[in-house]
């Protein structure tokens, strides 16, 4: 973000508002747009960021030339929403189009470089079961005596939680992130130490454009060395085991459960 000190935030839901605050706190001028002429809590945000410029409705692609980065909220498709022309123009110009999780991932890397903070990151995705698995994983980690924060699609948003815990000195040992395909689509820097892909069934095709693009977004949860937990009963999940060292792949099944090993007396 060196070309310009101006950024464009598309969508002023919870993630967009958090991103706007984040950018403003780093000295950037924030342009913000929303499909609604008066999104909830806009007045509050404008009081927090006095020089915030708000645009209601579609954004002219011309405005992209003024900014160095575009942040798009997860509910807005980069390709099929009213903001698609602006996103297309940004990509054409080589301007990064990111989501809130990408900002979270960047800040983690910055914190590690500056302070050595290196928490374990657990990612959870899948068409169904994300929230339940996220909550169970968080409870198990807490029961083991580790400090842990659950965030992401389950709420609250990860960037906001990172900012909050950094300010009060309570950064956790673990982050458990529920990640939707929408969030993963605009994420490049996140490195999960472990991640679960529970299942992939047809969903959100109107947002992604095709089943193939939807599945590809889900698989972005994995880095090359991420420990993967996959569902043996789901072909879409198991595709993520292909070409991966066996020690990085763990599978589960709720249908075919092996008999427990019995000890001989």
Predicted regions and their residues:
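N-terminal leader/targeting and accessory segments in enzymes
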Residues: 1-99, 103
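Short, glycine/serine-rich, charged loops/turns that create anion-binding
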Residues: 14, 37, 129, 155, ...
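Active-site regions of enzymes building and remodeling cell-envelope glycoconjugates
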Residues: 49-55, 243-254
